[in-house]
Regions:
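Eukaryotic intrinsically disordered, low-complexity regulatory linkers and tails enriched in Ser/Thr/Pro
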Residues: 1-93, 97-130
Length: 130
């Protein structure tokens, strides 16, 4: 894999079957792997595997479902899935790059606004996102 999560990564979104795209501050980067694979690889790149990161999350906040993952501590790279991480259509969002979020006119969508002014609709209700 040739991509690691970094402080400019806003989200990792699925595209075609088995592929995704990293949404960054200054553009989008196509990736030939799933969004979960990007998260797993990035955890390992920064020294601790994904399952260990999930276990740490559970230990501290008792979250098992759609739990945030600290990809890297010192840079505060924290990502969370908007649905089950095993779902191939899951979007992973950067916790620290989100400025605000609001209800969409569509019932099962939320508009997420990032620190750089970029916004995107994600396929999850406002109540679930909140």
């Amino acid at each position: 894999m040739d991509y690691e999560i970094n402080d400019e990564t806003l989200a990792v979104i699925p595209t075609d079957e088995g592929k995704c795209e990293a949404i960054e501050l200054h553009g989008n980067i196509p990736i030939k792997d799933t969004s979960l694979t990007v998260i797993e690889h990035s955890c390992e790149y920064f020294g601790i595997n994904y399952k260990t990161r999930l276990n740490s999350t559970y230990k501290f906040i008792k979250a098992r479902y759609k739990a945030p993952v600290v990809v890297e501590e010192s840079s505060r790279l924290i990502f969370f899935p908007i649905s089950s991480p095993r779902n191939k259509d899951t979007v992973w969002m950067s916790y620290n790059n989100i400025l605000a979020y609001e209800k969409s006119e569509e019932k099962n969508e939320t508009i997420v606004k990032f620190n750089n002014g970029y916004s995107m609709k994600v396929p999850v209700s406002y109540y679930t996102f909140n």
